Amino acid sequence: MYLLFCPCIREPGLRASGITTERDILAFDQVLSRCRSYGIDMRFLPCPETLYLGADRSPATFSERLDTPDFRHLLDQMEREIRSTIADLGVPYAIVGVDSSPTCGVNKNWRSPTGRETGRGVFLDRFPDIPAYDVYAVAMSRIYLAGPLFSEAERTWNIRLAQYLRSYAYDVYLPQEIGDSSASRGMDAHLEIFSRNLSALENTDIVVAVIDGADADSGTSWEMGYAYAKGVPVIAVRTDFRMVGAIEHVNLMLEQSAVVTHNLEELREALPCPLPVS
């Protein structure tokens, strides 16, 4: 399994002058680190804008400077070369692009000065058969796994979920793995566990929360609420078939603040960019 990358993720200097932010650099670094940590093969595409306009260039939309026969000819040539590589290596799992780019955008692109348009940039649009993810989606690699951990069955399920998420190249923080799984502890241990869990919540990209049972675990509910208030996406896992109301699977405040999934397949589909590594 390998990924095709837009080259500016590794070399931000290829981008137009002045558009790359510190947040962009952090996302680029997180993506590269994720792939290196899990041994994911990274193949980098050439940059059509740099080849056509040069490295030191001001920002411009497609219609302003790229809508020319010469640029289309360049894209034709680049596509042939990339298709040849794919014929040798096999189809990549996905392309990692950079939204807003007129050539390498995934969900949005600058086609004209009137504003960003929905859809891929003109270069990535030549590969509709290959899934594409924006670099920010791939950078969301840290998961806080919240759930009850009081019984052997609960802890076993949590471990299974953590292993499942790690098999898609996610860095999973599981509280029970740092000692939050025993009733025999003093107040100092309570404070240490709370502080470590809170720090992990502060630095996570996603919260995955187990909400099985007649009522969701109170600690898990707190963690979900904290994440939601911080703007962190929450994905809930409820395999319990019981309902708490006519149309509610669980308390409506939890249900409305999360994407609720009911099995591992639905959980995988709800993740922003699962990368299979096992």
Per-segment meaning from a language model:
Residues I9-T21, T103-G105:
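Short glycine-rich His-centered loop
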Residues Y52-I86, R116-M140:
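Divalent-metal-activated hydrolytic enzyme cores
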Residues A137-S278:
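Conserved catalytic or regulatory cores that recognize and/or transform ribose-phosphate-containing ligands
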